[in-house]
């Protein structure tokens, strides 16, 4: 199992939020948290709960592995 990379998450969160054209407040409104939560997650002062990570991925239209900075390897099924 791949390890969660908080630094990659922080960077991906900020980069993808900006690419989506969202302010911290707009993303906070989409996932029903306070602006300060987004700020703390992006600066690494706090780590989000899993429910918030899922909500962020959905709000930004990306997969959890992408958001978390986890490389997903395709399995070789021998076909």
PLM features per residue range, with description:
Residues 1-19:
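A short, Lys/Arg-rich alpha-helix, primarily the initiator
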Residues 1-3, 58, 68-79:
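Short, charged recognition helix plus adjacent turn
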Residues 12, 23, 49-52, 63:
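Residues that mark the N-terminal boundary/hinge immediately upstream of a DNA-recognition element
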Residues 18, 29, 58:
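Alpha-helical residues within the helix-turn-helix
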Residues 21-40:
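Short alpha-helical DNA-recognition segment
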Residues 32, 51-66:
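DNA major-groove recognition helix of helix-turn-helix/homeodomain DNA-binding modules
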Residues 37, 47, 66:
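Residues in the helix-turn-helix
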């Amino acid at each position: 199992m791949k390890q969660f990379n908080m630094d990659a998450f922080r960077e991906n969160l900020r980069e993808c939020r900006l690419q989506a054209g969202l302010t911290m407040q707009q993303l906070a409104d989409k996932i029903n948290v306070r602006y300060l939560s987004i700020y703390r997650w992006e600066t690494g002062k706090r780590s989000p709960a899993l429910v918030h990570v899922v909500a962020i991925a959905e709000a930004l239209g990306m997969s959890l592995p992408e958001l978390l900075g986890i490389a997903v390897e395709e399995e070789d099924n021998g076909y």
